[in-house]
């Protein structure tokens, strides 16, 4: 009985068979097939060497090694420029997605979204020429087209992001729009202090010397001062308006009875 039981147990026990795509031989044979256009291995090699030609490799190798493989300096520079061009073509989509591989259409949509966000932040309408070659991930500045347009049309307030700044006139705003931050003369700090003091005193007198003015910052003070000026203008208009006096009850009765007496006559 025991021998028969051991034989039956030996027949029942079997190692689980692995599917063909999980075997080590299959994985080793198809390891090179998991490549995408973005992660494609370079086909250019140096003298049957598996190391691809990039800018870092050319910098590490000395001039003697380069001449040893029968390559001129011009050829090395040409290959170096090609490698930099390939690096610039690859768009860095890692801030938007954690996946290692994506389709070209998805990467293109990420790039268009980033370009649109740039236009919303730094432009009111967008790029004048509608350029699609701008790369926000490589260059911060999109070019001088918008600056030339602003300098050619200084009267056009529609293209200016800065509409009003405390203590700055129209010429100062035009300089800021042209990114002329560095000036030869020092800024007129006394003029700015006078403006801030004038606004602070006006708010204090209107609020009956309240301590709230001291807790506000300069830009909040300027906003409150503008609101105060609008309110004072409205109050002045109401006072200057010719208002009809309210008729009293005695005058209403007299007018009523006088009309009745005239009707009897």
Curated annotation (Swiss-Prot):
One GO term (biological process): protein ubiquitination
Keyword Transcription regulation: no
Stored InterPro entries: APC9
Superkingdom of source: Eukaryota
Keyword list, A-Z: Cell cycle, Cell division, Cytoplasm, Mitosis, Nucleus, Ubl conjugation pathway
Subcellular location: Cytoplasm; Nucleus
This protein's pathway: Protein modification; protein ubiquitination
Keyword Cytoplasm attributed: yes
One Gene Ontology CC term in the entry: anaphase-promoting complex
Subunit details: The APC/C is composed of at least 13 subunits that stay tightly associated throughout the cell cycle: APC1, APC2, APC4, APC5, APC9, APC11, CDC16, CDC23, CDC26, CDC27, DOC1, MND2 and SWM1.
Function: Component of the anaphase promoting complex/cyclosome (APC/C), a cell cycle-regulated E3 ubiquitin-protein ligase complex that controls progression through mitosis and the G1 phase of the cell cycle. The APC/C is thought to confer substrate specificity and, in the presence of ubiquitin-conjugating E2 enzymes, it catalyzes the formation of protein-ubiquitin conjugates that are subsequently degraded by the 26S proteasome.
Protein name in the entry: Anaphase-promoting complex subunit 9
Organism encoding this protein: Saccharomyces cerevisiae (strain ATCC 204508 / S288c) (Baker's yeast)
């Amino acid at each position: 009985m025991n021998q028969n039981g051991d034989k039956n147990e030996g027949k029942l026990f079997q190692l689980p068979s692995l599917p063909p795509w999980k075997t080590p031989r299959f994985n080793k044979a198809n390891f090179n097939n998991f490549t995408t256009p973005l992660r494609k291995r370079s086909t250019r090699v140096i003298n049957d060497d598996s190391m691809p030609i990039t800018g870092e490799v050319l910098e590490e190798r000395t001039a003697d090694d380069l001449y040893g493989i029968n390559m001129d300096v011009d050829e090395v520079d040409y290959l170096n420029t090609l490698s930099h061009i390939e690096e610039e073509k690859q768009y860095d989509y890692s801030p938007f997605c954690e996946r290692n591989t994506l389709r070209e259409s998805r990467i293109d949509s990420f790039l268009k979204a980033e370009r649109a966000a740039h236009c919303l932040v730094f432009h009111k309408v967008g790029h004048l020429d509608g350029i699609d070659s701008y790369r926000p991930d490589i260059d911060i500045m999109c070019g001088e087209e918008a600056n030339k347009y602003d300098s050619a049309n200084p009267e056009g307030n529609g293209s200016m992001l800065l509409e009003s700044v405390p203590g700055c006139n129209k010429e100062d705003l035009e300089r800021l729009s042209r990114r002329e931050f560095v000036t030869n003369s020092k800024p007129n700090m006394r003029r700015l202090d006078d403006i801030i003091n004038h606004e602070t005193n006006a708010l204090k007198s209107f609020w009956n010397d309240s301590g709230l003015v001291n807790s506000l910052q300069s830009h909040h003070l300027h906003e409150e001062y503008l609101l105060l000026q609008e309110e004072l203008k409205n109050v002045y208009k109401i006072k200057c308006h010719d208002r009809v006096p309210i008729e009293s009850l005695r005058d209403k009765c007299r007018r009523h009875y006088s009309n009745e007496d005239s009707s009897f006559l």
